C-alpha cells in the first residue's frame, strides 16, 4: 500500500512539473507580448508626429490604417480561426497515437486549401477596395490602405493554421516566443522607419511582422513534422 501511495505521489509530482514547465514559460511570454503590443500602439502616433504630421493628423492616419483598414484585412483570418482552433486537439491526438503519415497529409491539405482561400480573397479585396471602403466607411479614404494591405491575408491565414498545428504538436511555447520576437522586430522597425518615411514605415512593419511570423512558424513546423517524420 505504501509503495502504491508513493507511486501515485510521484506521478502527481511528475504531472505537476510537466504542467508548470508548459504554463510558466507561456505565461511569461504572454505577459511580454501584451506589454510589447501596448508599447507598439503607443509609439506609432508619436513617431508620425516626429515625421512631421500634426498630432491630430497623425492620430487620424493611424486610425485609418490600424483602426479601419487593418480590421477589414483581419476578417478572413478570423474566419479561419473559427475552425483552426479545432486543429489543436486533433493534432495532439494524432501525435499521441504516432500517426505521422496522417499528420503530414493533413498539413499538406490544410496549407493548399488555405492558400487557395487566401489568394481568392486577396484578389477580391484588391479589386473591390473602393466598394468595400464606401460600403463600410462611406468614403474612399481607406481604399488604398485596404488594397496595399490585402496580400497580408495570405501570410495571416497560413500563420494561423501553422500556429494551431504547432500547439497541437506540443510547441505552444515556440509559438509564443516567435510572437514576442515578432513584436520586438516590429517595434524596432516602427521606431526607426516612421520618422523617415512616415506611413510607409507602418506598412513595412506590418509586412515584415506577418512574413516573419509565418516563416518562423512554418520552419518550426517543417522541423517538427516534415523533417523528423
Residue ranges, per PLM feature:
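C-terminal transmembrane helix end/exit motif
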Residues: 1-9, 41, 163, 192, ...
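Interfacial transmembrane-helix starts/ends
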Residues: 16-20, 66, 99-116, 120-128, ...
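Residue-level signature of transmembrane alpha-helical cores of multipass secondary-active transporters
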Residues: 18-34, 67-70, 74, 114, ...
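Helix-terminus/linker motif at the lipid-water interface of multi-pass membrane proteins
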Residues: 31-76, 93, 133-137
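Helix-loop junctions and terminal segments of transmembrane helices
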Residues: 73-98
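Short membrane-interface helical motifs at transmembrane helix boundaries
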Residues: 120-138, 196
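Alpha-helical transmembrane segments of multi-pass membrane transporters
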Residues: 125, 174-199, 209-220
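Membrane-interface junctions at transmembrane-helix termini in multi-pass inner-membrane proteins
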Residues: 151-179, 192
